[in-house]
């Protein structure tokens, strides 16, 4: 189990120098069921378990399309896409990521392709930008807990309740609280940056995380695995869709919508300007936005929807979209500030200073 303090020694280096290599992505090939006529190369920071139902459903409409799906962590996807853009290579036809601030930067740097259709135009305004980035999911950040380790009276439903729990029962929950490593996880950093917006309690919560010896991981799958096995008791700011998926696969976890405010993102897609197969990329994008694609995503992949009710497994208001709790991450130029290097370093330093008061601040 890699703990938060293990990242302190390397964060300054990671923030100060460029990464020369991108970790190899895991590529899965979905052969064309009707015989291959073309190949679509999709690169995503989205779990294969979420993408596979959508890919196979799309192939019922496009049986002659072979789809190659390459899965990354968010920062590696950003680095690889940026490199292809700068070098004008063409191995990526469609890019999907929950770290929408990174996609905004790529589009702002001229890496995207313009596309407009009746399906893109009907999207909520906060989920699209410049006809180049398109959000296709509705995913809240949630609190997840292990049902065997956290009794009902301890389940936190607000950040104040989580703070008070860590203060009142430090021995019980020391080393048992997990969240994203914001130095490695693009979505973790994005969620933290939104937590920092006008949230007076954030500093106290981070200090409590430090006293509780916060455990950090790069990825949702690692955090959910530790929550399922009992290595962790509570996970903070996890992507709700992945948590529901883990629970439906048998993980003995509970899922809570925070009642003070709920950050919600729309996982987004964009088509690189160097795509070799724009027509099929546009087709797959329209599928993701279509009624059929949205229905399949709600049933098999992401479980939440823009207008629907909460999944029955989730503790929260039935109609989340009208609950008044939402703090949506608007896809647009304001996200460029999240990628500003100086602001990023300040947030990383504040995070580490608060959680490691006796350690070195990068």
Task: Explain the meaning of each model-derived region.
Residues 328-362:
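Conserved C-terminal helix/tail region of periplasmic/extracytoplasmic solute-binding proteins
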